[in-house]
């Protein structure tokens, strides 16, 4: 009889009807026989009905509001006609938190699909299940199954039944019993309980693998019907029936493969791009038409196996060489296939390789093949069967609601389904299945025996028989499991005909004979294999970890082994020899899946799509997150479901609402990890987008959120189900926004680009709350705030609000065509236009500038040829997209107004500001003077030092007892402020000590103190520096001459911040070392406002501020101590808040010193930089704005602002950069001088240039962009000699010496051809100063608006940024160039010809106008560059410096000039009449240059630098310790270590009793160090190695923090080359120099070339990078771990100096290659140089965009010389056009690349 069905939607019981069955009887004895295992059973009859029935076990739940099904009575049960195909009944909602149903299910506890028999217990852990016969209206044969044994019993009614049941009826009836209401397969409420999901991506015969997530993973489906599809025999894979013909592979004479017969559109091009690249050839192949598998033998001896049918394609590679290739010439090879093996024949013999079986292909494609050729897979908890007729996947009829975890193939060839703790054989119509509590893994042997691993802490192995029908009669055997003496836990199990294999969580292998189950010992005790089953001569575990097992087609067990590169390989376990056989790489594989017919959500609508700038596109469809895949150019499901709402934050991140909880989405570009090995890539290497559910947003407690609007994860607005609206920010408690003005309840919230909050209410109203109102934490602002109505778009009702592209507010019109999206721009509603998918503001500008420039790659080199055109002094004329001439003239030359020329105004302002300072910094200057006055008053007051125990810290501690619990907050805040002031006073004094005595020009890096605050090593240069500092103070008339050291000592004595008083101790030490300090006068004379020459004036003022505030804190303590008991302390709390947040927190000196400024000069430079760009963006006719509009194609400033925002948001890599520069200056040159009697030379030349430059650079940082605003003073001086000779007429016609033509009026036309050469030496120097800061992503829009509006002063702009650092840099260049010129010209003198009879002793002056053409070539013979850079604030310091030697032949420039000149000459007297022979007179000539020049240049430069950052050491926190412990626990998986880690993490541990929080942290850290003290860093386990390294470095920093030392954050040595081929090849000069010097370490190019030789993937990537349009290649080295340990040791004891570190970083033996990068910089430069003689003016601006074209990042483990693998990112990692086309064609056919 049939169980009742449950209606899909209502949950009501549907009672089936009963009809008589008149089928003939069959003998039950025949059905009791064991069926043959290799037989195929069609699901169209008995099997299908049985599958549909037993499939009830795995039905997906419905919503929990459905009522439980009531078991029907016998009279209501009817049997359907045998020919009918009864629909599968529905399940009631299963209570699983991981179901695919409505969100209400997400918190329900999962239950098993089977329940224990109440009267039986199973010691084995396997639960016994029975299905009892039900009453029937006639005497039918009744069969009872005792599950999972499946024991058959005859019902008493069978003997006298007139109509015994057929086999089909017996099975169908039995399976119906499985799902009857009183069956033990039911839940307690009469409904079937569904199951938890396991990881579907790694199927194995065990049903699980190591590393399976404990969390929810989509379940799988059951059972299939017999289709008309084709079937392949297991060994030779010949097609049996109904197959679409498959292509074959051909090799040409050169070994190049031809895939043209693969007729699926897009497939042949895809295979060509992966398997037939120019360098790929093959030695042999085996391929036949209509055969499922094809084989290719690679040139390196590895075998490729290509398996294709119309449901999937897979290409995998053998793990080891199938044929060992020796020598350069490979042998002649022939391949022959026989069953499941491939034979490789050479002259030296035959080698045989086993081909991958069904389980191998299923492992990577998730498509399983049954006995009769049916293909099945699980997708989104549902079973699908492939229909070869329609080439689509279909859910078998009646199984639409049946859920499974996964499918796998057993050693007997059957397909098994696992669901929670149950395993069912899907290949048998009898459906044998078994359940064991807490099932972890299972495996089925060829003889149908199954091993089931259960339990986590206490584990057991159950051995049972899975044979259909009679398997239940076989006794089960259970053994407890003990691995490695109880130290290890089992994770996976594999069973063969003779052996049991087990893998533990550490990846080690165990084995035992199956006979071990025959003994009486209740436990199976095993030790890991050491001598047997080794890989590369090493036991498994460590680098090579067993993660699971699968079965070959012969039933043998194959171990899945993950290597250190993260690749999984299958290796057959040879039980005879106890060895691993050569296997197959299952990770680096090409996989295509046909996804037609699989349930997929539709693409998200426009309203549900978010363009997240650099992060890509995401969307929401049917409650599921979708991501845009750029390869096939379509939407793909991200696997995140049950999402209620998706919204964009102002920070360009996505946030989701799920089940009333607010989460961030983690969206980032994903670049595949590639193993460093000798094989090419089969898997997709193009970048994709990775989407993961992030952490729940903090601060919402247990509230159920129903609407929200996000600025960032720290600042947002949330509305809960109680209609409570709250505003959240990082530094304040949540503020309830109970603000009037709304009508109705809020339905949705959203922000506009200004962060104004908009709300849509239930009444259809739209309202706005200004940013200032909802972000304010002041009560007064909230009381004044009010919601204001906003006009609806067109007066139409709004359905929902969104924040879409560019953070613009959008609204969806209700019931409008085309979804009716509108956006609010500039207060007006406009139709919403979706941003194009591939639009990228940064790439667009980069491409525009690149297309405008004229550059070419020189063939067979890595060099770039560049063309430049200059016309009438204007450069950049060659560009196709440049500013109009009128705009250029107004910006750089002349503005037709009465306004003072900009360059003159800038020069005047600069002189004034250097003298008086900046008006906008007046408050800072005044505060400095006031602080020094207050410090003097403390000094002069002469107060007594406090008695012992009366320091500030002790007094605050004493308040705890006085104030009690109600004063705890006040006491804590007092101590926090005191500690901050004391620590910072120490930091400020240490900063002074580090700079005092430093001689920058002498490269003296340390002052009295080194970077750690310890005394630096004394040196002559330091002593000289101290004397200079002392002398400078004495000569400085702005200095007060006071003894600041004495004033500070007196103040610290009086204030006494603590008993230790470390600042006073440090001050005493510095004084003893010769520190002499004064401070500026309170009133600076001559109107100068401040002392700009004081090196650390702001540091002194900040030190004074700290001490003055400590004095005020002491006065406040006096008031607190005088409080009577039970007094109100709120007034004092307000005073403390005012002191902390206003008096101290908003003090201008604190504000600017927190930005990293230590002196007024640096502050003014940063201020000036910001001011310059505020003016640049505000004025549309400024050179910067004009040039940017030309570069970006913007029509006006508003459009330019939008594009600049987009550019900043699209900065993706840390190496991407946007640069702006404004420059102006003056050039001086000497006239053309001819010495007396030196007509052909040598002639001296000289020149000088002075420039003022302003620079803005932007690059990506974590959570925002980093901006550099820098001012630069640059100058150069050049000098040289030239020579030349006039060759006309003699050069052309020696017999006709006439060289001039009389044109009358005493004027002469003189033609001339001249050749000349010159050598010039140039010395250039520059100094930069400025500020570096970060702008968070959410503030980019507002920051750019502030720049363009220009309403704020620079200090206000700086206050809006975060993480400021001061910037200072110096650069020195020396260049030696040689040039040659060929000049053909003609000139007419403007003055009369000199009279031959003129006085020979008189000077003569003449003028001439010339016109002509000149060709020139210039070669840079030698260049030397050195520079230093410092960025710092009081928490961090970055140092950068050049490490260059003189380099030769760096640049060649050749070109031509067409010019007109007006020149004047002075000729010195010779004393000889002109008519008489005599010496050539000396002359000086000056001329302008009007005309045009065309130049071509090639640059071949190499620059080296070191760069390192030190941070002030921080003590480890509780969160840091938890993260550290977690990492150690994940690396060390043995039970002993896990237990000890858990003990240390227990807060109730006795070792923490009575300790303060900081002491508890120290005790736990000590415990971790003790635990791992005796464990050396393992060389065979990278994860453990890294975990121990993290522990070691954390302990070093924690100890260093106690001494206030700094620790290294990162360090690098970089080599940059404009010749891209320099990445992998050395120049001839470098090779010569390397041969004559002792080079103990190979050069970078040699290392890279060796890497390329070892890895063809890497070689191909580097060749692509070298062949790109890149303009710069860079090799980055980083310290090896051994060097890091030395540096950490020096940081810990305070002896490591910057010079020491710099020297260490130059030792290549201690460095490893970290990164290889190729950039392309596109520059839009427009400059003007006035064509005037002797003195000229220059003005210009440029925009540059640097894009990372290719970047290879290496990853290292315990081996510091050989990388584990690498990633490839940058623009070249994006899918190519050909890949997109192939993937798009395949997508149309239903095939998608598996990523």
UniProtKB/Swiss-Prot annotation:
Subunit and interaction comment: In planta interaction assays, interacts with the A.thaliana protein phosphatase 2A (PP2A) via direct interaction/association with specific B' regulatory subunits.
Record localization: Secreted; Host cell; Host cell membrane
Annotated motif ERMRS, positions: 1787-1790
Chief place where the protein resides: secreted
Domain notes: Contains two functional domains, one in the N-terminal one-half and the other in the C-terminal one-half, which may physically interact in vivo and are both required for full activity. Contains two WxxxE conserved motifs and a predicted C-terminal endoplasmic reticulum membrane retention/retrieval signal (ERMRS), which is present in most AvrE family proteins. The WxxxE and ERMRS motifs are required for AvrE-mediated virulence in P.syringae pv. tomato. The N-terminal domain contains a plasma membrane-targeting signal that could drive the entire protein to the host plasma membrane.
Gene knockout outcome: The deletion mutant is reduced in its ability to produce lesions but not in its ability to grow in host tomato leaves. The double deletion mutant avrE-hopM1 is strongly impaired in its ability to produce lesions and grow in susceptible host tomato leaves. The double mutant is also impaired in its ability to elicit the hypersensitive response (HR) in non-host N.benthamiana leaves.
Amino acid composition bias (Basic and acidic residues), ranges on this chain: 129-154
Miscellaneous section: In P.syringae, AvrE is functionally redundant to another effector protein, HopM1. Mutation of either avrE or hopM1 alone does not strongly affect P.syringae strain DC3000 virulence, but the avrE-hopM1 double mutant is severely impaired in virulence.
Protein name per the record: Type III effector AvrE
